[in-house]
Design a protein with these regions (language model features):
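Sequence-specific dsDNA recognition surfaces
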Residues: 11-12, 29-47, 60-90, 110, ...
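A short beta-sheet element
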Residues: 59-60, 73-138, 158-159, 273-274, ...
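Non-catalytic DNA-recognition/assembly elements of restriction-modification systems
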Residues: 7-41, 164, 172, 176, ...
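Short coil/turn segments at secondary-structure boundaries
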Residues: 41-49, 148-150, 224-228, 258-266, ...
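Hydrophobic aliphatic residues
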Residues: 32-35, 137, 182, 249, ...
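Amphipathic alpha-helical coiled-coil/heptad-repeat segments
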Residues: 1-16, 22, 169-223, 384-437
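Periplasmic-binding protein-like
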Residues: 142-146, 357-361
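A short glycine-rich beta-alpha junction/loop motif
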Residues: 8-11, 113-120, 151-176, 327-335, ...
Length: 437
């Protein structure tokens, strides 16, 4: 049974409640020096790649939101002699305070680093144990308070506001004991999370192998095969053909609307951007946007239209639109393919989830100086094509098989959510003194 402290008192802070009688309340500004870092322009990054006599430079993307760890080997380094960049000392915490990752991404720093301007450094004062402050910032109640103070279009919390958030401060020996215990417990939980993630990766790889086998070899393993003539597709059933995407669509591939969306409004078309798409679903957990009828004219999606991302980190990502999503228009960084009636759109979409499609993308990237796939390249993409009835049978088979695999993945993801919640509850109980080490 977990130990508790001998006596408690009301700390006067509603979101913390009762605390051990010996503990003190204070504000974040009483525990740490807070300051943000410095940005590096994209065109300047080539000047910051020499790691000799330099410290790592940490950007928001270098912090893992699950494991709360920093990647020190991202390829960017600041020379020790460069006085233009602020420094986070060892035993400090970096936390994102602006944008979509605000309050979510944080990491304890075990070495001297420089860091981006969206990150705030919490450098502990003398008599404050840095790892304890890190865990306090990781507690769910602190995260709730942080989120309640987010303001502005970009969404963030400024440093003066952060400084005045309440904090708890036990004795330095108690801080160290709590941090050491949480290191052990959170490490154990992180190992369990990692195991679940490995199993998810294996299931995802299996799912892709099932898809690839079906869309390139068919469902009958006994049919005669022939060479497709395309290296990354390989052998295909004798009765199949290979065709370019441009020959199986209505009209031409179409770029989306080059418009700025407005806040989503019922009755107007939803504006689908690449950030709206996750796991072939339209996300509901982001701020949706709309276009006016005039802006959306000519860009309204029809049932089973396929969208392709043409640039950026998600280049090559695909999505099949379903009527159930309501009226939608698509954005300019997406390309639409309207599959003709001689072919099955679901089969074509499944091909874009195959390892053959991934290999095609890699070949395109090798030929290009930047990762960009325009309509000209997509239009020439080779696709193995069985007769329509067989396309439909394969799509139905994959609907069932991938649904089964997705159900197994969902179970693993639910387990990860439970483990994360358990981790947060343990952190809360010990950094607020509800339990004693």
């Amino acid at each position: 049974m977990a130990k508790t402290y001998d006596t408690y008192k009301d700390c006067g802070i509603a979101w913390i409640g009762n605390i051990p009688s010996e503990w003190k309340t204070c504000r974040i500004k009483d525990t740490s020096l807070l300051y943000t870092g410095n940005s590096i322009k994209d065109e300047e990054k080539d000047f910051f790649q020499d790691m000799n006599e330099a410290r790592p430079y940490i950007a928001t993307k270098d912090i893992d939101a699950t494991y709360m760890s920093a990647n020190y080997n991202n390829g960017l380094y600041i020379k020790h002699t460069d006085c233009n960049f602020r420094i986070a000392p060892p035993s400090s915490t970096l936390m994102c305070i602006e944008g979509g990752s605000a309050g979510r991404k944080k990491a304890f720093i075990d070495r001297e680093v420089s860091f981006v301007n969206k990150l705030c450094c919490f450098a502990p004062f003398e008599g404050v144990y840095g790892k304890y402050i890190y865990y306090f910032l990781c507690s769910p109640n602190f995260e709730d308070i942080f989120n309640s103070k987010i303001t502005g279009l970009i969404g963030g919390v400024n440093i003066p506001t952060l400084k005045n958030i309440e904090c708890l401060l036990p004795s330095i020996s108690e801080q160290k004991a709590i941090a050491t215990y949480l290191d052990k417990k959170c490490g154990e939980i992180d190992s369990l999370i990692s195991l679940q993630e490995e199993m998810i990766s294996e299931l995802q790889a299996y799912k892709q192998s099932v898809i690839t086998e079906a869309v390139t070899k068919g469902l009958d393993s006994n049919v005669p095969m022939k060479d497709s003539g395309v290296e990354w597709i390989g052998m295909i059933p004798e009765g199949w053909n290979v065709s370019s995407l441009k020959h199986i669509i209505n009209g031409h591939l179409q770029y989306g609307a080059n418009e700025s969306g407005t806040l989503f409004e019922e009755g107007l078309p939803r504006y689908v951007r690449i950030t709206d798409i996750l796991d072939n679903k339209l996300r509901e957990d982001i701020q949706k946007q709309s276009l006016t009828e005039e802006q959306a004219s000519g860009f309204i999606l029809q049932d089973k239209d396929i969208l392709f991302a043409r640039s950026g980190g998600t280049v090559g990502k695909s999505f099949i639109y379903r009527r159930k999503y309501g009226r939608c228009a698509f954005a300019g960084y997406l390309i639409k393919a309207a599959i003709n009636q001689k072919n099955d759109a679901d089969f074509i979409y499944y091909y874009t989830l195959s390892s053959s499609y991934d290999e095609w993308k890699k070949r395109i990237f090798i030929q290009a100086t930047i990762q960009n796939i325009g309509a000209d390249k997509y239009s020439l993409m080779e696709i193995p094509l069985p007769p329509l009835s067989e396309q439909q049978a394969i799509a139905s088979y994959l609907d069932e098989k991938t649904s089964q695999i997705d159900s197994l993945i969902a179970i693993k993801q639910e387990k990860i959510t439970e483990l994360k919640d358990y981790k947060k509850s343990i952190i809360y109980e010990y950094v607020t003194g509800k339990k004693k080490v």
